[in-house]
Amino acid sequence: MPFPPAPQGGFPEDRVVWVFGHPRSGTTWLGHLLADGLNLKMWNEPYLGQVLGFANLLRDNEPARFQDPTFWMSEQQEAHWPASLNTFFMDVIARQGGAAKDHAGLAIKEPNGTVVAPLLLKALPQAKAIFVLRDPRDVIASLIDARKPGSWMGERVAEEFNRTRVVNQSIKRFQRIAAGLQELEQTAAGRLYEMVYERLRTDTFGEMRHLAHVLGIPCDEAVLRAAVDKNAYERIPAERKGPGKFVRTARVGGWQEELEPGEITAIHRQLGDFLRSRGYEIPGEAGGRP
């Protein structure tokens, strides 16, 4: 029996906005701002990007196999596979993304698919993307807190808590994301907005208004201001935020007090070039964002 056709009235490709960034970079907060302030329908972490993760694994671990033209996503087949993936992703969006009526667009929050963002944007040449960039040191400090026993994430993670493992895994992930971001800037030039978390914290309304302008999303400033106020960290009740909670501190630069000296050294040694290239200050060096 053939499958039923996808429903009509879904989101066209040019109204799809992917939200990428390392987990704990503020993508959830941004998602609320997009939904409440810019009227985008939010699709929270469908893990669509994860289906492409095997391509990166093959490229890293078996480069000869990755180059083999019999591999359907090899470079030799690049004239073909983006169209196939486009058909797949747009069908999934049509079937599961819901109706486009009454929404300015569909925001797909996919932090766990960030490492394959370039592949997604190659396959969806009309879609837009937001990349949330936050100081990796604050991100890693947040992940350590989240993984501790008794924390919101620690209760869901089976493996025993190990600070060193969390730091090392995060560094490796940031290295992959750094390479992916460079590729994404080329692949999605003109339809990519790099949202710096520290700027979003300083001027939330101004950054969101600028994002809407750059990506061509309609913006009612009164609605946006109300959304900014509604979703401000300061508005969250004290019992719902703090150490061990999903919403922690939203503090910029807290890593200096929260990370151990050896962890900071390891991060600077392995991610120093990325930090400098994105304007983040390394103590003892001149310039950059604090």
What are these regions (language model features)?
Residues 1-17, 144-147, 153, 175-186, ...:
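PAPS-dependent sulfotransferases, especially Golgi type II membrane carbohydrate sulfotransferases
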Residues 16, 39, 128-129:
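Beta-sheet entry/capping signal
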Residues 32, 36-116, 123, 149-161, ...:
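PAPS-dependent sulfation machinery
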Residues 57, 62-63, 101-223, 233-245:
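PAPS-dependent sulfotransferase catalytic domain
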Residues 21-23, 45-49, 231:
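Short, solvent-exposed turn/loop segments enriched in Gly/Ser/Thr/Pro and often Arg
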Residues 11-34:
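Walker A (P-loop) phosphate-binding motif
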Residues 49-50, 137-140, 228:
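Short gly/pro/ser/thr-enriched loop/turn and capping motifs at secondary-structure boundaries
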Residues 18-20, 43, 132:
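Short hydrophobic segments within beta-strands
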